[in-house]
C-alpha cells in the first residue's frame, strides 16, 4: 500500500500525527498505523474539555485485529472531539488525515512541534526502503 505523508504534519513515535493550526493542534493517527490495524469497528475518545498530560491516553481504537490506545504528544485541553469518527469509525480508516482526525488540543504552553518527527523522518521509520 502507498501511504500519504503530507509535509504539514509531524508525527509522534506512537504514530499520532499533529497539524498545527492557529495555535491549536489537530491530532489523529497515521495512515500507516490505521492500515496495520485493519478494519476499524469502534472508536472511543476523551471528553471535550478534558485536560490531559503529555503521554496520557486520549482514546482507544478497536479493530478486528486489536485494541490500541492513542496518546497525546503534548499536554493541554481537548477543545474539540470528532464525533463523526465515533459514530462512523470507517471514517478513520478511509480518511485518517482528512475527515478522520480525532481531537483538537489547546496546548498547555507553546507546543514544540520540532520535538516530533517530520513527515520525511516518520516515513523513513515506517516504510522500508
Swiss-Prot record:
One of its GO terms (cellular component) is glycine cleavage complex. One of its GO terms (biological process) is glycine decarboxylation via glycine cleavage system. Keywords: Lipoyl. InterPro entries: 2-oxoA_DH_lipoyl-BS (IPR003016), Biotin_lipoyl (IPR000089), GCV_H (IPR002930), GCV_H/Fam206 (IPR033753), GCV_H_sub (IPR017453), Single_hybrid_motif (IPR011053). Binds 1 lipoyl cofactor covalently. The keyword Transcription does not apply. The modification N6-lipoyllysine is found at residue 65. The glycine cleavage system catalyzes the degradation of glycine. The H protein shuttles the methylamine group of glycine from the P protein to the T protein. Its cofactor is (R)-lipoate. Disulfide bonds: none annotated. It comes from the Bacteria. Residues 24-106 form the Lipoyl-binding domain. PROSITE patterns: BIOTINYL_LIPOYL (PS50968), LIPOYL (PS00189). This is Glycine cleavage system H protein.
Amino acid at each position: 500500500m502507498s501511504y500519504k505523508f503530507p509535509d504539514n504534519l509531524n508525527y509522534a513515535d506512537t504514530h499520532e500525527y499533529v497539524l498545527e493550526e492557529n495555535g491549536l493542534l489537530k491530532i489523529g493517527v497515521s495512515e500507516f498505523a490505521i492500515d496495520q490495524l485493519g478494519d476499524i469497528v469502534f472508536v472511543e475518545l476523551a471528553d471535550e474539555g478534558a485536560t490531559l498530560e503529555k503521554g496520557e491516553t486520549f482514546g482507544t481504537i478497536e479493530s478486528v485485529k486489536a485494541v490500541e490506545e492513542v496518546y497525546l504528544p503534548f499536554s493541554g485541553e481537548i477543545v474539540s472531539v470528532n464525533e463523526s469518527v465515533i459514530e462512523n469509525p470507517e471514517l478513520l480508516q478511509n480518511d485518517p488525515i482528512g475527515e478522520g482526525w480525532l481531537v483538537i488540543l489547546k496546548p498547555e504552553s507553546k507546543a514544540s512541534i520540532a520535538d516530533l518527527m517530520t513527515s520525511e523522518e516518520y516515513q523513513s521509520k515506517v516504510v522500508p526502503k
